[in-house]
């Protein structure tokens, strides 16, 4: 017997995707009336999902102990060495006569914001006396700099 291929006997194999069941179209369809949700109750209503609720059983995140802690955010400040200030004076970008404020340092691109706190460290050597605004200062830098302080000396670190 010779089988002739015709359009009516082409078989493409099993269906790739199972068709979804139509819900709520009468009791004869098998998923009518309550549409597989059971009778009444919170889960039968719309917008049901209760996160972390396990049917009255103590939920997993209350069963497990608390772990660790959240540390407070660090005070971020820019560190400026005395050698950098001397380099800026030598290059002529800063004159040592007027006070060096946060605005001056911001305009030169030394700090990223005028509101940022500044800590001056004593790495390097200053050849001239300088009046500078700061928030924190090290002892070695304090001996080299004439201070225009934004905090009192008792608060400096």
Swiss-Prot record:
One of its GO terms (cellular component) is large ribosomal subunit. One of its GO terms (molecular function) is structural constituent of ribosome. InterPro entries: Ribosomal_uL15, Ribosomal_uL15/eL18, Ribosomal_uL15/eL18_sf, Ribosomal_uL15_bac-type. The keyword RNA-binding applies. It holds the Pfam family Ribosomal_L27A. The keyword Heme does not apply. It comes from the Bacteria. Keywords: Ribonucleoprotein, Ribosomal protein, RNA-binding, rRNA-binding. GO terms for biological process: translation. Belongs to the universal ribosomal protein uL15 family. Binds to the 23S rRNA. Part of the 50S ribosomal subunit. This is Large ribosomal subunit protein uL15. The gene is rplO.
């Amino acid at each position: 017997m010779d089988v002739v291929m015709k359009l009516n006997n082409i078989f493409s194999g099993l269906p790739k995707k199972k068709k979804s069941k139509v819900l709520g179209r009468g009791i004869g369809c098998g998923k009518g009336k309550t549409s597989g949700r059971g009778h009444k109750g919170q889960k039968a209503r719309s917008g049901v999902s209760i996160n972390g609720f396990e049917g009255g059983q103590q939920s997993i995140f209350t069963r497990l102990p608390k772990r660790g802690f959240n540390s407070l955010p660090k005070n971020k400040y820019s560190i400026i060495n005395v050698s950098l200030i001397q380099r800026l004076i030598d290059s002529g970008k800063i004159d040592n006569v007027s006070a060096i404020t946060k605005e001056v340092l911001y305009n030169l691109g030394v700090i990223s914001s005028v509101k940022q706190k500044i800590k001056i460290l004593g790495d390097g050597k200053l050849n001239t006396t300088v009046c500078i605004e700061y928030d924190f200062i090290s002892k070695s830098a304090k001996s080299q700099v004439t201070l225009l302080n934004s905090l009192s000396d008792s608060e400096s670190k």
